[in-house]
Amino acid sequence: MIDFSKLEYPYPYIPVEKRYDILPEHSICSIAPAEESSDDFITGNGALRVQASGRPYTEEMAYTQELLYEPLWEKTPLPPDLRPYLPEIRRLLLEGKPEETDKLLDEAQKKAGFDKYMNFDNKILYPTGSPRLHTAFWLSFTQPEQSDTRDYLRWLDTQNGMITSIWTNARGAFRTDSFAAYDGDVIVNRLSAPEGQLDVDVSITPPGRPFKHGNMVFKNPFVKSTHELTIEGGMITLAWAYNPDFGHKGFVAAIRLLPEGGTMEKIEKGFSIKGATRLTVVSKIVKFESDFTFACKKAVQDELAAMQVDFDKLLQGNEKHIGERMDRSRIHLGKKEDEVLSGEELLRRTHSDKEIDPTLMDKLYDMGRFFQIYETGALPPMMGQHNINTNLQVCAGNNTGLFDEMDVYFRYCETKFDDFRTNAKLLFGARGLLASVHCDPDSGLYYHFSRTYPHYCWTGCLGWVYNELWGYYLVTGDKEFLRTRLIPAYKEMALFFEDYACDRGPDGKVIFYPSFSPEDPTPNPGYETVTCASINPTRINTVMDIAICREILTNLIDGCKTLGIEQENIPHWEKQLADLPTYLLDQEGGLKEWAWPTIEENYNHRHVSHHYDVWPGRAITPETEPELTEAIIISNRKRGQQDDSAHGIIHRALTAIRLKDMEEAMQNMSQLFNHGFVRRTLQASHFPYRGVFPDLTGAVPAFLVEMSVFSMPGIVEFLPAMPDYLMHGSIDGVWLYTVAKLEHMEWNEHGAKAVLTSGKAQTLTLRCRRKGARILVGGTELPMDGDAATYAFREGETVQVEILF
C-alpha cells in the first residue's frame, strides 16, 4: 500500500490539522514552491500584476503593468482594401474553388504589405500576433539556504489578493507577503524574519528574456530598446525606452526598499540587506505613451519616495475592493473542513475518486471571479483572441455581479467603433461595424492576416461581445443602457450584415461569404488531423455568424419594441431576419457547422462555434427548439478534440449543461479538471500540463452557475444540470437573465430552498426537471404544468421558493 503522507516535496509542509489557524477563510494554498513559473501564484490590482514562486531562498517575482504591450509599429496599418477582389472571391466560392479563393485573398494581403507581419512555422502560415504583454522586470530575493527547512506553506488570499509563503528553519520562522495595492497603485512585498535574522540580496533583471511558444520563437521586440538602471538611495529605478521607430514610448519602474534594522549596501543590480528583521519593498510602474525620455524617471521616483507606506492600511484597501466583490457570489459544494486542503491534495483526491472533488470546484469558482477582478483595470482580460478566449474569461461576470469589471470589457470595444467602421468598409465594402478578433489596447483595425487563419472573414466577433452587453441588460433591466449603448451598436451591426450578406442563393436566402468558422480547419498540430477533404478555411455560410446575426436582429427588434422607438425600421429588420440561411443537418441528424450543402464537415476540430445558439446564446433550449436541441446534442457528442486545447472542451461542456446532457457535461468537465488543465495553484492551462491560460479559469464559475440555475427572460429553472453526487450544496448571489436575483439557494436529496427577488413586475415560469418535483412560494403550493409553475412577482418582491422532490 502507498503511504500518501510520505509523498516527497521539496520541504516538509504544514499538515492539514495545523492549517486551520493559519489560512485565511477564503484562500488557495500549495504545499510546495513552484518549480516553473506556470505554478506561481499571481495577483494584481487591475493595473499592476505580480507573480511569486514561493521559493524560500531563491524567490524570483515577475512584475508588470497592464499597458506594457510590446510595440509592433508606430501606427497601426490600415487593413488591405479587398473591395476590388470581392466579386472574384465570391464567384470562386460559389464555383466550389476554395483553394483559388484563398490564393486570391493571400495575394491581396501580400500586395498590401502584410507579408512582413506573417510567421512561418512547420510550413503553416501564421498571422501577426496581437501585441504581447511583457514583464516590466524580475526581482530576485536571495537568502542563505538552510538545510533544515520545514513547516512550509504558501497561499493566495482571494479576499485581499495577498500571496504569502511561510517556512521555518534553525534560525526561526520566515514569511514573505506580496500584493498589488489599489490605494497608491503600487506592488508591496514584505519579508519577515526573527529579529536580526533577515539576510537577503534584492536584484533586478530587466525585460528581454526569449519567448518561445511551441516551435515558434518570437522575435525580440527590444532590439532597438535602450534602458537606464540606477541604484541609489535605497531605490532601484529602471527607465526603459522602446524602439524609437515605434514612437517615443517607454516606462519607468521605481522600486523602494525599506528595511527595519540591519544594514543595506549597494550591489551590482540592487541591494544587499544584512541583519534586518523585516524588509518592505514598494514598486511603482508607469507607462509613457509619448514624449518619453529617461528624465521621466524623476517624477516617478519623487512620487514613490514621498509615499507614506503603511502595509496594513494598504492591505485594508484591498480587502475593501476585492473582498466586497468576492462576497457578492459564493458556491458551497464541499465540506467546511476540506477548505484548508492544498491544490496538490485536492487534485490528488479528484484524480483518485470517481467524481470531481466538490471542494476543488468551490475554490475554482472563487479563483475564476478573483481572476476577473485582479485582471481588470483600464483594460479587461486580454489573453488570446475575441473568438472564444476573452469571451470565456469574462463569461460569468454578469451572473456573479462583477458589473464594474464587465463595463471595462464593454467600453474596450465601444472605444474602437471608428476602426471597426474602417474594417467593414475596406474589407467588405460595407457600412456598419466589423470588429477585429485580436486583442489590442490601442487599435481595433484588422491586421491579423494569413491563409491559415482568415479571421477577418469571421463577421460575428462584435455580436459575441455584445451578447454580454445584452446579458447585462437582461440581468439589470437598465433601459438607459439599452437605449444609449445597445440599440445604436446593434443598428450598425445590422447595417453591416445587410451590406455583407447581400447576395442570395438558390433558395432565396442571403449568403454569408467569404465566411470563416473560428477556427475550422485549424492546423494544430498539423493538417493531418483534419477530417474533411478541403483544408481551405474561407468558405460559405458559417452557422455561427448566421446565429449571431439572428441574435443581433432579434435583440434589436425586441429592444426597440421595449423602448417604443424605431417602429418604422422594425419591418425592415424583420425581413432581414426572415432571409437568413436555414441550418442543415448531417446524416446522423447532427447540426452542421456550415449551412451550405456542398461543404463537408470537419468533425475533429477543437471549436464548436456552430453551437452558439445554445451557449452563449439562448435561442435554442429543449423547450423552444426540441429538434435542434437533439441535433446539437448529436453534434456535440460527435466532436473530436484535434489538439486538446481547453476552450473547445469548455464550449462543449457549456453546451451540454444548457441542453441537460449530463453524461456529456460531466465527461467534458472531468477531462478539464482531471487531465492536466488545472494546475496546483488552481490556475488553468490551454493545453494539458503546459503553461497558464485563463479560459477555464473564467469559465468555471459559469459552469457552476448554469448547473445550479438556468435563466432567460420569463424563466428560472432550479438545479437544471446538477449531478446526483453534488446534491448537497448552496449558492449565493446569482443575477438572472430576467431582471431577477437568486439571493440564496440550498439543496439536498429531498429538495431545494431558494430566495428569489424580482427587479420588475413580471410573471415567471419556475421550473425543476426533477421527477415529481413540487414548487411552493411563500409556503403555498403552486399548480404544476408538467415540470413548471408560474408566479406573478411585484417589482422588488422577494419570495421564498421551496422545491420538494
Question: Which residues does each predicted region cover?
Answer:
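Extracellular/periplasmic, surface-exposed regions of secreted and cell-surface proteins
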Residues: 450, 457-463, 475
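Aromatic-residue-lined binding/catalytic grooves and analogous aromatic/hydrophobic interfacial grooves
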Residues: 2-449, 453, 471-473, 491-494, ...
